[in-house]
Amino acid sequence: FLSCFKTLDEFEEEEATWIIPGWIPEGQITLMAADGGVGKTTVWCNLISAVSNGVSCILDPPGYTRKPEKVGFLTTEDSVRKKLKKKLRLAGANLKNIISPDFLKDEDGQLRDMKFGSDKMKQFISNFRLVLCVFDPVQGFVPPDINMGSRNAMRDCMAPLISLGEEYRTTFLVVCHTNKRKGAYGRD
């Protein structure tokens, strides 16, 4: 345990690199939070399309270029077959560079165990070596024993993504919904 600590002069200093310049740093966790129905899925589909196809996205500065990369998304909210494939295709995505689980093939329910910090999550990231991976929404990937209202529990839950990001250079975009309860602040 104590061997994990060192003085700052022993750390190699690195410049930040960006998947989306000024917005989404490479190998780190970025959160996207907003009310339902404002276009979170449209934004992340645009980002995935751009990265998969090597073109600029809506958040890029003018003239920004990139090379096509492998990306992935995990969603427990929208159907890949009924909504997301079409949305990505219409956004100009390179569908061969996008990985997503096929829940119809998951006859024994193994995909339900793919949570933050799980061996299955590490296996997914290490096998596909994605540049960008989207989780929509965060609730679908938090283990059931974690209290999402506890900041410390959520930090511990998501900490393995930091290690995976640095080891495999995968950037994580985690989509969060604001309170959907009717009558919550700003809803009416």
Task: Give the label of every model feature segment.
Residues E13-E15, I20, G36, P62-D156, ...:
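Conserved inter-motif catalytic segment of the P-loop NTP-binding fold
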Residues A50-P68:
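Post-Walker A helix-loop "phosphate-sensing" segment adjacent to the P-loop in P-loop NTPases
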Residues L31-M32, G37, T41-T42, Y64-R66, ...:
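Phosphate-binding/switch region of NTP-binding enzymes
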Residues E26-T30, E69:
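Pre-Walker A (Motif I) flank of P-loop NTPase domains
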Residues V43, L47:
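Hydrophobic positions on the alpha1 helix immediately C-terminal to the Walker A/P-loop
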Residues F1-I19:
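N-terminal pre-Walker A segment at the start of P-loop NTPase domains
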